[in-house]
Amino acid sequence: MTLDISKYPTLALANTPEELRLLPKETLPTLCDELRTYLLNSVSQSSGHLASGLGTVELTVALHYVYNTPVDQLIWDVGHQAYPHKILTGRRDQMPTIRQKDGLHPFPWREESEYDTLSVGHSSTSISAGLGMAISAQKEGEGRKVVSVIGDGAITAGMAFEAMNHAGDVHPDMLVILNDNEMSISENVGALNNHLAKVLSGSLYTSIREGGKKVLSGVPPIKELVRRTEEHLKGMVVPGTLFEELGFNYIGPIDGHDVNELVKTLKNMRELKGPQFLHIMTKKGKGYEPAEKDPIGYHAVPKFAPSNNSLPKSSGGKPNFSKIFGDFLCDMAAQDPKLMAITPAMREGSGMVRFSKEYPEQYFDVAIAEQHAVTLATGMAIAGDHPIVAIYSTFLQRGYDQLIHDVAIMDLPVMFAIDRAGLVGADGQTHQGAFDLSFMRCIPNMVIMAPSDENECRQMLYTGHKHTGPSAVRYPRGSGMGTDIEKDFTALEIGKGRIVRKGEKVAILSFGTFLGNALEAAENLNATVADMRFVKPLDEALIRQLAAEHDVLVTLEENAIAGGAGAGVIEFMMQDKIIKPVLNLGLPDRFVPQGTQDELHEDLGLDAKGIEKSINDYLAK
């Protein structure tokens, strides 16, 4: 699938930033229109992130037009909004492959392009990294400029403010751009603020401001009065006082969809010294009405026909694990008014929309603040409530200290509902849930469960909710197996697995939703299969039994082999002096790139055929 570039004559002239900078300024609005249309037509045929990129077209064009990329370093926070950047940096013809196996990476990726300064995927890292680059550039005496682009969601994270606080202290030359598409200050956008932005970033204003500071620097009270007067005058028309207090020169807010005004302002700001902050207002989904009306729905899209003005409806079928969790929350909250559900900005992805509407007083979206989410749950547990933290496996990494220090050490009853455990597919290395078993298994007091199907997931969530200490239930992205779901809740016995198939010689110890693959592989092998259920505590009696009755044990998990469930089995066997060959199957010691889940499982030998082959190869040694 390729798009006919002849239908985009101006875009055809700007395959790289060098070519873009040769275009007359008068052509930039036309370029933006073509780029936006190209993006819509491309993503609708390939699937991928759409609404964010539609909102950053003008900003992307202006940045590459003004800044000498890749010498000047441009950092996109998270990276959802970077599709226009990829199109303008020599990857236009590869866009149909984005998020696909062996295709373009879904986010800016250093290995992919010299224009991708920082590999990203998680939020709120851009200002810290940009500050480091700016400090190094200043130390080396280079004229290199650094720009960090961050959204109004990502800037709420503590890490972003930690970086700005530090930048205000060390005062390097850098620019932070806030891409604001939600805040209530949108009414400030208009001719007055665009004019103010040009004035505040212009050389006359800057020279007067800096000259005045030098003249009055020996008179501290007057210097302070001048500073505060300047802030208050600006604060009358712009909401920049907070960023000024952090040590930034605040400009804006300005219209982020007026490419020529952006170019003027950026040219002025590129020459300024010290930390600069540009606040732009944009509309997520800009230029495609359905995405403007439903930016959340069009954030990440499947293949669709833009002319239909709608996304294809789900075919229904088996419920996904996120829905299983959402239904559990609603059913459990009906019985337990002390249930408190917490999410760090993942309401839709975690299946919590219905719960947030039916139980708004028991629902807490803390924004992108994983550390706070975990310790908030700590406070609720101490107060006698029953908190549940709904979080993706990859994002729990960001709250690890709090998990240990604020939950596990005090043995508090906080349950972690860990979604996207294992390989998530198209989002690649930064989003694979490969490590949660490894980093949780070493924490004292933790109970860790890995369900094999939808009903087991529901009952494990109930088990964790009723447990008197910290617990975690980890489940994968996507649909279940079609298992019948019991409406009634049944608490499982902690640390007990079950044998689901009796065989000979080989026993497969399955942790999680690979159970179906294990059973299929076991048919030709005539192997025993156990659904272990608990990663911690392990069912030690069952391991002893399986070791005594079989020649070889095989552990199977969708987690890194290093430190995972299989490693726990071997540790126990060595401590118990059980000497039997053990084959660990799981994720390898490398970061797994994007692809569909099925493609990745096949590549890694974790589908039924791969499991059977690995076991036969091991037996043949």
From Swiss-Prot:
Keyword Transferase applies: yes
Binding site for Mg(2+): 152, 181
GO biological process, one term: 1-deoxy-D-xylulose 5-phosphate biosynthetic process
Record bears the keyword Ribosomal protein: no
Keywords: Isoprene biosynthesis, Magnesium, Metal-binding, Thiamine biosynthesis, Thiamine pyrophosphate, Transferase
Cofactors required: Mg(2+); thiamine diphosphate
EC number: 2.2.1.7
Stored PROSITE patterns: TRANSKETOLASE_1, TRANSKETOLASE_2
Gene3D superfamilies per record: 3.40.50.920, 3.40.50.970
Cellular compartments per GO CC: cytosol
Cofactor, free-text remark: Binds 1 Mg(2+) ion per subunit. Binds 1 thiamine pyrophosphate per subunit.
Binding sites annotated in the UniProt record for thiamine diphosphate: 80, 121-123, 153-154, 181, 288, 370
Catalyzed reaction equations: D-glyceraldehyde 3-phosphate + pyruvate + H(+) = 1-deoxy-D-xylulose 5-phosphate + CO2
InterPro entries attached to this UniProt entry: Dxylulose-5-P_synthase, THDP-binding, Transketo_C/PFOR_II, Transketolase-like_Pyr-bd, Transketolase_BS, Transketolase_C, Transketolase_CS
Pathway the protein acts in: Metabolic intermediate biosynthesis; 1-deoxy-D-xylulose 5-phosphate biosynthesis; 1-deoxy-D-xylulose 5-phosphate from D-glyceraldehyde 3-phosphate and pyruvate: step 1/1
Stated family: Belongs to the transketolase family. DXPS subfamily.
Subunit architecture: Homodimer.
Classification via HAMAP family: DXP_synth
Name of the protein: 1-deoxy-D-xylulose-5-phosphate synthase
Species of origin: Vibrio campbellii (strain ATCC BAA-1116)
Lineage of producing organism: Bacteria, Pseudomonadati, Pseudomonadota, Gammaproteobacteria, Vibrionales
